[in-house]
Structure formats: C-alpha cells, structure tokens
Amino acid sequence: MGYVGVKGGKDAILNAEELVEYYRCRKGGTPLKVSQIEDQMRLLIDKIISEGSLYSPRVSAIALKQTEGDPMEASYLVRAFRSTVPRTCFSIPVKSEEMFLIRRISSSFQNIPWGQVIGPSRDYAQRLIRFELEDETEFSVDPPKKHDESELDEPVEKVVDYLRKQGLMQNPQKDPEQKPYDITRQPITFPLDRSARLQRLTRGEDGAVLAFGYASLRGWGSVHPTIAEVRVGYLPVKILHPYWKTPVTVGKVMVTEVESICSFSKTTDPTTGEESYMFTLGYGLVFGHNERKAIAMSILDRALCAEHPTSPIEDQEFVLYHIDNMESQGFISHLKLPHYVSFQSALDRIRSIAAKRNETATDASEEKEHV
Amino acid sequence: MNPLLSVHNLKKIYGEGCDDCMGPSPRPGPDNLCPICGSIIACTDVTFDVYPGEVLGIVGESGSGKSTVLGCINLTTPVNGGEILYSRLQSGIRNILEVDAQTRRTLQNIHFGIVYQNPHLGLNFSISGEGNVAERMLVADSRNFAAIQEKVHNLFERVELSSARFKDYPINYSGGMQQRVQIAKALINAPSLILLDEPTGGLDVSVQAKILDLIRSISRELNVAMIMVSHDIQVIRLLCKRIIVMKHGRIIESGLTDRVIDDPQQAYTQTLVHSTIQ
Amino acid sequence: MYNFALLDENSKREIRRSVLKAIAIPGFQVPFASRELPIFYGWGTGGLQITLSLIGKDEILKVFDQGDDDSVNAVNLKRLIQLTTGVEVTSDTQSATLLQTRHRIPEQTLTSDQVLVLQVPMPEPLRKVESRETETARMHAEKDYGKMFVKLYEDVLHHGEITLSSDYPVLVFDRHLMATTPIPRWDVPKLDQAENLFLFGAGREKKIYAVPPYTDVEPLSLEDYAFRVEDFSNKQCVFCKSTESYLNEIPSPEGAGQIYACSDTDFCQKNRNQ
C-alpha cells in the first residue's frame, strides 16, 4: 500500500510561511526601508494604490515589501486592509480644472491655452539600460535642480471645454439628483450605470485594462480616439465640514486624467430637441501616475457606452467581470486547492458511462452471436 | 365559426416616429418611410382574421412588412400599436400583446410554432437535431426521456428525416433537413397556429417542392392553422385558400386566392401576378 | 489594529441584511457588495464574509475543506477567524454551532441550532447553458429552466446518462434553480427538508443564497433517468472500515479503485474511536 495521508497539514502550512520569510530575506543584507520603496518605486506604488483603491503610498510600500515585490499580491493586501476600515465620510466632487499640474499634454491641438507641459515623462527617452545605476551611491546621485512641482497652480481650461463652447463635443449628461454608484457598498447588477463602470475600470488591473483597450484600438471595437488631454497632478480632497457644512480641503491625491475625443455621432439635445453632430468623450481617471492605464480606460469608457454591442470589448459583462485583479488572480489561484471530492464525483460519472457503453457493446455482440 | 386569431390595426415603426405615423392611417409616401419624420413604417393598419385549420398567405416584396407581422404575432417583435386577440388560452379571448412573460412563453412554446427561412433563427446549433425538438416538450414540463424520444422520433419519421441523422447537430444537416427539423420543432407540442416565414426560401427547386408538399399534407392531416409568408405567389397559391397582399407596410388587397390571382384589383397585385405566372 | 471579526460593523450589518433576504427567498441569489478579504477571492471569501458577519463571541466554530478540518484552505480560514475573534474552534461536528465548509456537508446530520455556511465558487447553475448574467437573471425571474433540462436530455442522448457530477443543480422550494457549490451528489439529499439552515456565499461573484430549514430541495432529473448519488458499493474506508460515507480514492500501486478513505475526517476519527 502506498502512502496514505490521513489529514491535511496544519504544520506544513506554518512551515511554508516560515520558508517564505526565509526567501524574502535569504541573502541577508540590509532590509529595504519602506520609505525607500515609497520614494524610489514611485510608479509601482502608484499601480498598487490604483488597483488597491486606497490612496496610501505608505501602506502600499509595506505591502510591496511584504510580498517580495509582487504588485498583484500587494494590491490584494491593500484591498483587504481597506475592507477593515470603516467609512467615516464622503469627499465631495471636485472639478479637475483645480488640479495642480505636473504634466499636461494634448495630441489634438499644438497650441493650447497655458501650453503643453511635458513634465516628468519617459515618452521621449531612449530605452537603453543605464548600467551606471549599478554603482549608484548616495554621493554619486546627481539630483536635478529642484523643480517646483506645481508649476501651474491656477485653474487651466480644458481642451474638451474649448470644443464644448463651439458645440462640437457632447455635454456631460448630468442628473444632479442622481448619487454616484458605489461599487464597494452596492451590489453589481448589469447593466451598470456609467459611474459604476468607471469605478470598475479605474480599479482594474493595469495589464487587463491595457489589453482590453488595445483590443478595441486594433479593431475588436470601434474606438480610435484622439487624446484631448493627458493631465497628471494633484487633486484636492474636500469634505463638508461636519458642523459648518462648508467644503474643507483635507488632503490631496495624485491622479492621471485622460479625456479622449472619440468618433462623432448625431445627438439630440434633450431640452431643445435640436439635432447636431458632436464628438463623443471617453474618460479615464486613475490614482497615481499611470498614463497608459488612464488612456486605455478612456477607450473602454467609450466602448462600453455602445448601445448595441457588436464586439466583446463593447460588452459590459465581458469587460467588467474580467478586469479586476482580485477576482481573476483569486479564482485562477484557487485551482491549486484540493478538488478531491468533486474530482471523485467526476470519476464516478466517467466510469459509470464507460461501464454502460461496455454493457451495450457486450449485448450487441451477444445478439450477433445469436443471429 | 369564430376566428382563432384576430389582428387589429397592428403597427410597427422603426425609428423615433411622429404624431402622424404613430396615429391611425398615417400619410402614405412613395416608399415605406414616413414622409414627415422619415421613420420606417414596417407595418400599419394591419387587420385580418385567421380561422382554425386554415392556411392564410401573406405575399409581398421584401420590405413590405410581411415578416414583421409574423414577428409581432410570435411576440418576438415589440409593437407600437394595435391588438392581437387569441382565443385558445385558458383564460378565454385575450389580447396577447398584453400578457405576462410566462404566458408569452407558453404561447410561443405550446400554442404557436414558427419556421424561419434562416435555420439559425429557428434552431439551436449547439445541441442535436433531436434535442432541438425535445426542448419544446421539456419546456412544456415533459420529463420522461423515453416518452419524449418516442414522440420526437415519430415526428421525425413523419417529416421524413432519416433516422441515422436524428442525433446529428444542425450544422451537419442539408438545408432541406434543417427545415424538416424546424417543422418538427414547430409541430411537437400540437400548436393551434404555425407561422411560416419563407420556409423554402433558400432551397433548390426539387427540395422546395418536397417541403411544400410536406407542409400541405401536414396542414390537412393535423388541421392546424398556418400563416405562410412568401414573396413567391406560386408558393402561396399552392398552399393557401386566402391571401393578403402587402406593400409598404400596409395591406393593399385580400381575398380568396383564386379570386385575387384571376382578378387582381390593385396595380401592384397585377404586376405581382403577371410577373410570376405566365 | 483590527475590529472584532475583521470587517467593520457597517459592512457586517449590510451582509446580514443580504442573508436575511436570502432566507426569505429560498434559492434566490441575492447580489451583495462583496468585500476583499485577507484571503484570495475564490478561496472561500463568500463563506468567510457570512461567517464573519454572523459570528459572536460564544460561537463554537468548525471549518473544514473537502471534509477535512486540517486541509490548507480550512486551516487558513480558521486561523484568520480565530486571530480576529478568539472564538473556540473545534473539529467535532456535533458540538460546533457555526460550521463553514468547502464542498462537503458533514456525514453526521446537523440539527436546528447549527448553521452550515458553504463556500461557493460559481453560484449560477445556469452558467453551464448561458454565459450572460442578464439572461440568466431573466430565466430565473420567469422560471424558464427549459435549457437546463435540454442539457440533461442531450446527456442521456449522447452518453446514456446524466453526466453532471458535483455541483448538481437543484430546484429549491419548487421555484429557484440553485447551484450546490460543488458538493458531491452524495450530499445533495442532505439539503432536502433539513433541520438546519444552509447559507451559501460567493465572494468573487458577489452573491448570497440560502436554504432555510425544512425546505424542499429537489435534484433536477428526468423521470426515467433519476438522480443518483456516487456509487461506493463494495468499497470501504481503509481506516474506519465505514461503508456509509463519501470516500476519496487513494492512488496506490495495487491499481485504480482499490483503496479508499473517508472524506469527512471527523466522522472517520469518531468511527475509529468507537
């Protein structure tokens, strides 16, 4: 008789955890400082903030350290932490014109009011590995002259508003009575309204948002936008003062905002009934500095507005059910769990069917013999 | 004799519609568009009766609204006006445009059967031919495999489907066989009305003749009422005692088939008759 | 650092409301705003959210995975619940008040003061025949389950048998078709007219549903192809010699189907102690 395990292994699980700790620090050396991760892994931290949907660079940095740099696992930790924190109040809507910009470009017009601000961007860099970084020390670092991060600190008119003034861009359909959906507190049922779709998208996994957006751009969908504006900067977080009921700024968050100009369509003004041709808008907004995700999100926002979906990317259920990192990695990983019982049940079926087949085959051959 | 089905002032508009085309007797134009708002008038002011056991023909060119009428009766196309009275529901004569979802499915599944020109509309290509027909009985709460299978096989023999092909998937059937399976599917729950939407449209002539022959013998044998839609007046003449001629979404002429074909009143009907029968 | 039973109180209350609704409409999947937990989605977060929302300080908890109290998933969940609540944990089915399970119902019959919480990966029984949520919602609303019976018919037609193995669909209270999580067919009859309450949680798919005590639960079947549980005739557990429990096959050099052991480890242990 072969090896027969009686029970699963609680001890083994505890040992596995110790082993993980060993691997995390296996080469000895100085443990990474959380503050270093936070400061020097800026874009990675931003990804975790965005997918974890909790604006805390510090918590994200700890999570990243704990998970040996696995961003998916780290953002999972952040989301789980988020579930333990009570919601004490809501921030009130802010206008993104109020953003303190560190970067702002437009691909639709060369000369825009306040100009194009390239800011910190690798868009034009050569993708060459800089081997000298291997020998970088705190003394050899040559920090560039300190920039004032908030170069533009007064409201800057948006390119889409410029188009709106000319009647060329759809106005947002605002219903002041309607509260935005909250996908962390309300069940998701399809069809989802736009505010809920945008929330699913902005929490979506970087790579998944990118892949779906790319598919639309390549022809599995019909959105091929011109970017009105990419804005990176800090937005104020405002709440209503609990006593005075007046807006108070309590902090700021870095975000990337993208407005895409998409194909034009015939629209009827709901109030005047006038018909006109107007561009449609695709909107992307993500926590942190992540331009490709925000652009892809703007494509998906537009694609999911399709009234009669013809491609998977225009299908709400297809895109929004499969874009979340927590749901996809969790379910894929669960395949590693024991499935002994259900597999035993499947074995029972396949053997029973095979036995039945054999019976029929034997019957048939016996009949033949009789003949 | 009381009618099985009475259609009154049926209207279907594609587009936004306006007061004129949404109202009774909209202004006619040179085509099936509303001359005021440009919406498509798929059908309007369509009124007719169907009697138990009769085969009624609807003829007209493509875009005349004949298939729309079938879709409205089968409750798959939402209408913009009118009523459809049906006499065989347990609750008596009912306007079937106003029934709840469950009654709607009972009507579609048990009381009516439909055969489409395009087999992809009528058959589920992911299950066997036999499963397609069995589905209708299963939906009607039959739960005995052997009993269902026997009934399906009998019907397959009646529509002359070769027994070696019962378990095949629709994709492997010829066009004629697909229509035979659709006919079996329409018949399985002994409906009181069968809707035939150009059932022999895409078939070659010899197969077409066999299928028409089958439909004719079934209608006599089972005494089931049928509405047959076709652009081909020959097909209609073969099967139908009464005929309706449609153009631009409206009924322009109706009557006994022999009368309409021998003595067409409308210019359009005359063209239709003379262009197809020499 | 963390609240009792991890989740904040408002979230727990919200989940309890969904549980109440689920009990009121047996077999109906109540959508809820599922939270992310320190356990992966797909690893029992639905069951865990129900357990965390219901658990009180006096509860005696049993968590088991595939019948095994010591299996990885069960150990994980148990440690988390214990860490955040400090409740007493047992492997004894009889003395537990709140039981959370992955894919098994205990061999020992549960009583009216026990609640069994089941972890559900795929709550939608119609997903096998329809991939779209909006369409399955309509099918449930209209009790339009014809497609599911067609699946059974096609099974018999092509294979001579119903091929559904675990996660066997059942009709609850003669109204809603319900997925059985995948428990094996062996456990399905235990749902019918049971003394205890069954709660089902699907975290990733964000649904909660329930079978209240003394509710009719009927496995889907055709009249002449009746529902049948797994066949373990002429087989027995290698440890406790039981012939009346769900057995897991143990691959061995002697060949397939030779050695079996109880899937329910508590049941097996008690049998051996007797």
Model-identified regions with their sequence ranges:
Chain B
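ABC ATPase NBD Q-loop/coupling interface
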Residues: 83-106
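Helix-to-loop junction immediately C-terminal to a conserved catalytic motif
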Residues: 74
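Conserved ABC ATPase signature
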Residues: 169-173, 177
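ABC ATPase "signature
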Residues: 254-255
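A short, surface-exposed alpha-helical micro-motif characterized by mixed small hydrophobic
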Residues: 236-238
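Conserved ABC ATPase "signature" region
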Residues: 26-28, 146-164
